[in-house]
Amino acid sequence: MRKFYLFYLMTHLSAQGSVMLVGGNAESYGGWSDDPYGWFVQQADSGKIVNIDVSEASAWYPAYFINLGADSSSHELQIPNIFSANSQNIYHDLVTANGIFIEGGDQWDYVQTWKGTLVDSAIHVVFNNGGVIGGTSAGLAILGEIVFDAENGSLTSDQAIANPYHPRISFTDDFLDILSGVLTDSHFNDRGRLGRLVTMVARRAQDHGEDILGLGMGIKTAFCIDQDKIGTVYGKMITVIHQTDDTELYCVPAEPLRFTHLKFHQLLHGAVYDIDNRVLVDPGENMSYYEMPYEYLNNYSDLTINGSNQSSENYGEIIVTGITGDSDNWWYGGLGTTVGDTSVPDAVIIPKMWTDYYYFPNRIISGLYGIVSDPPKFVFYLDDNCSVSINENGLMTVSNYAHILDAFPDGYAGYLNGVLPGISDATLHYFTESDTFDLSTYYIVESIDDELINSNYFAIQSLYPNPFNPQTTLHFSLMKQGIVKVNVFNIRGESIDEVVNEFHRPGEYSITWSGENVSTGIYYFKMKFENEMKVVKGVLIK
């Protein structure tokens, strides 16, 4: 049975409009883009839509919008310089539109030509009056509160990770700000940009104390965000990252980035995400819920895994094949899996992570591909001259740097058309020299106790009565808002009931469970909140 997150919508008092973010690559009549661009037309009330560019604006877009139901007055508009950007005629043309769409190109051209002009003002007027604003590629890049402006040119993930203060990392903070608290990146998967987005989010945290939401938009993908800031994925996939309460940051010039405990989602077509509350509303039809048993024990032996050796992938439980074949295997279905020697249980190991730019997409996606083949899993992304050592207790120690994607203990996972992997609620760590990570964290029940159980985010006061027949009540309190999950397991570790899987606000709660349909015995109540999990033992006596 599919599970859905319940959520609370906050009423927005402003008349702000809606937004369409497009990751790049070609739209087409009758293709993937019809649904999101049709949504754009609907948000514009089938009125006038103007597509704009600094360079020559495309006549294809208005024809496409009109074909999807927009008013026949829709048209393209080139705004090539500051003089034109301050034209009253252009301003009037734009403010009388129901939607404005910004084409791809170079975001620095847009920043230096339109920032602070009447074009800037007109876009805000349309949006604040309930209109729809959209952009693709560079047009997408300028819609967040924080803009990676590419003033000094672009950069790759390996450059960003090695030096978070690389001169090509530059921002504009006071341009359109259509999506507050958001930084976007386009062509995300096909250019392997995970490392640079993580680095840019880190820079904003380090330099300005900001907790921003990073949105990585894949090609042939649109993210359509309504007036309540609820976005739906169309096409392929988007990546969402943000800090958590446990995030640790070390970000200095000319040293590898350390940035831990980042929430990570890669969401597929049909997924729905609340960007204000940072909650997955609906995983969509392409991802299914997975969960590990409440108690699960693995054995480890002393081992060093070297990121310079491709053969290191054999130490994992799953090996992803096709990584070093065609550089587009991730996109066209050329990845596969085989079995490793399981020296590191539940692991997918990706060596030589940033060795060759053309294989960045294959290597990043292959880790997710391995997780989805049999979740939950850990992914070790290791570069040349990097390694990790694991002792017999499962404690991992990093040499130089390593990236770990932790998909435990549960979440949603699946493939789009059997090819592109999606996952929710994973945790991403960018570790550096001497950092440690306990691979056995999820394998031992953290506590089975009838007394008060505390964590950073919640407290279980009691399970009462206990023993019980047939009902008992779990009393708990929350220190922050989020999704609460409570499952009941029998003594064999089999999940027999999901008691709750809902959004809760901070406060005191009680939930009652009935053992009317099960036999006398010991039952375990597992409560999960954020990345913490606690278990309470109950005894049913009939």
Protein language model regions, located:
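Sec-dependent N-terminal signal peptides
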Residues: 3-13
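C-terminal and late-domain segments of enzyme folds
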Residues: 16-45, 56-61, 149, 155-309, ...
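Positively charged n-region of N-terminal signal peptides that target proteins for export
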Residues: 1-4, 541-542
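Catalytic nucleophile loop
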Residues: 102-104, 126-147, 304-317, 321-324
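ATP/NTP phosphate-donor binding region
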Residues: 31-32, 36, 40-92
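C-terminal outer-membrane/trafficking sorting elements
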Residues: 452-542
